[in-house]
């Protein structure tokens, strides 16, 4: 399978702090690639490089066969973990404005936005001010704005934060549909259940070092024997056992 993103021997240092140390990964085209790791592992630095907010000290990033450059910015949609909308603007007005910043004409933006608003059953929010919406409602708007210019690469950083289970399932369905329609997706999270459900391939990173990388299926096969049994002794001397992976 052709790789859409190739990160080759990338390192980044801030002062004496090594944020990334000789990282190499390959993200197959039209796949969902999971970035896993604790806070401070290096996931955000990697995402910032893909968005060209910062540059590697060494190594290179290949974007769809070309060395990453400014022309690729319009082909990326990024939903950061820290989100924010202009509170006093109307929802529809702001969504059109943000779509135009991504190169979509006003007429086309309104057409695409109305499609997504109907799909998410939120068309009634169009003329409301952002400050009238709950956090979860605002995050739906930001998800829509992230995908509105139909980018080739989507980067989602903890996209389910703040959502109830119903809306989490709604977004999971949309993410899978976006992949099936041709998008390549990088999904940064701490949630292993979501990784198993959504991701084709993953990388586990910690302290700027790659710990493991591969397909979710292969990693599960490689580590399937890593289990243990917990024996719980109750006061009535009955014994219960629980199998853990």
Regions found by a protein language model. Name each.
Residues 129-133:
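Conserved ABC ATPase signature
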Residues 51:
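Helix-to-loop junction immediately C-terminal to a conserved catalytic motif
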Residues 96, 100, 108-125:
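Conserved ABC ATPase "signature" region
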Residues 154-158:
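Catalytic Walker B motif of ABC-type/P-loop ATPase nucleotide-binding domains
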Residues 173-245:
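ABC transporter nucleotide-binding domain
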Residues 59-74:
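Conserved ABC transporter NBD signature motif
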């Amino acid at each position: 399978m052709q790789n859409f993103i190739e990160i080759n021997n990338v390192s980044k240092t801030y002062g004496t702090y090594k944020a990334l140390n000789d990282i190499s990964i390959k993200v197959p085209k039209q796949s969902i690639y999971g970035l896993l790791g604790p806070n401070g592992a290096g996931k955000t630095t990697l995402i910032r490089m893909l968005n060209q907010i910062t540059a590697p000290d060494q190594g290179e990033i290949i974007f769809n066969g070309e060395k990453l450059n400014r022309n690729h910015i319009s082909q990326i949609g990024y939903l950061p973990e820290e989100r924010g909308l202009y509170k006093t603007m109307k929802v529809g007005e702001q969504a059109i404005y943000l779509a135009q910043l991504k190169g979509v004409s006003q007429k086309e933006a309104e057409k695409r936005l109305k499609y997504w608003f109907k799909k998410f059953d939120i068309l009634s929010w169009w003329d409301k001010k952002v400050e009238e919406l709950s956090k979860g409602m605002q995050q739906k708007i930001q998800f829509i704005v992230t995908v509105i210019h139909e980018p080739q690469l989507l980067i989602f950083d903890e996209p389910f934060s703040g959502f109830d289970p119903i809306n989490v399932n709604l977004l999971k369905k949309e993410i899978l549909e976006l992949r099936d329609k041709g998008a390549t997706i990088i999904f940064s999270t701490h949630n292993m259940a979501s990784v198993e459900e959504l991701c084709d391939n993953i990388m586990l990173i910690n302290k700027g070092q790659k710990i493991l990388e591969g397909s979710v299926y292969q990693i599960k096969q490689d580590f399937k024997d890593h289990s243990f049994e917990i024996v719980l002794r109750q006061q009535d001397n009955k014994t219960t056992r629980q199998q853990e992976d």
